[in-house]
Curated annotation (Swiss-Prot):
Gene responsible for this protein: Prl4a1
Residues annotated as signal peptide: 1-31
PROSITE patterns given in the database record: SOMATOTROPIN_1 (PS00266), SOMATOTROPIN_2 (PS00338)
One of the GO BP terms on file: positive regulation of lactation
Gene Ontology cellular-component terms listed: extracellular space
Name this protein carries in UniProt: Prolactin-4A1
Chief location category: secreted
Annotated InterPro entries: 4_helix_cytokine-like_core (IPR009079), Somatotropin/Prolactin (IPR001400), Somatotropin_CS (IPR018116)
CDD domains associated with the record: prolactin_like (cd10288)
Amino acid sequence: MHLSLSHQWSSWTVLLLLVSNLLLWENTASAMRAKLLNVHNYTSYGDTWNQAIKISQDMNQYISDLSTHVKIFYAQGRGFERRTTRCHTSSLSSPENKEQAQQFQLEVLLGLSHSLLQAWLNPLHHLWAEMCDRLGSTPPTLYKALMLKESNIKLLDAIKNIAKKGNFEINEKANYTAWSELGFLQSPNRDTRYFAFYNLFHCLKKDSNNVEMYLKLLKCRLIRSKC
């Protein structure tokens, strides 16, 4: 009996030591990453990422709702999905999946997220007004369009905050083709006008989904180390 109890106590001691060492290693790793990122409060920095990702997710929900609305009421049966178009952000070299994004440096990927959002400032500024004037959208739909515009601005600010806290440099004058589709949104030709709205949401959805993917991947690489 004495040997059995001694053996149990020995096992518990080893287990406690392992847990203690694991916690110590995690704290040390967090401190090292915090020092590397030049941030004083690593937990707060993680919260900043969480807030940015939440804004991105909300933004994508607004886009999904509005895109579905346009498809059902203005694009259905018109064959818009068979047309080939080029998005105004196509000049930005954007990875389209996690495997491609993994090949980009952290600072580059964060800067790309900023550039994509910045490229949509002008289109989203006009979108909600044109949905009212050209589509006769109802207040609930217009509210989502307005919230979409505001979410884009908030997410840009969140990314700037992340860059500032993490000592990243972001190029705020990214080289992308200026958006020039306003005339098509305002076209007196119904088919041209409807396709312009359809294509805007097609491009916006792709870019915004990519931004959310980039932010999640960046947080994973910076905060958790393994992805």
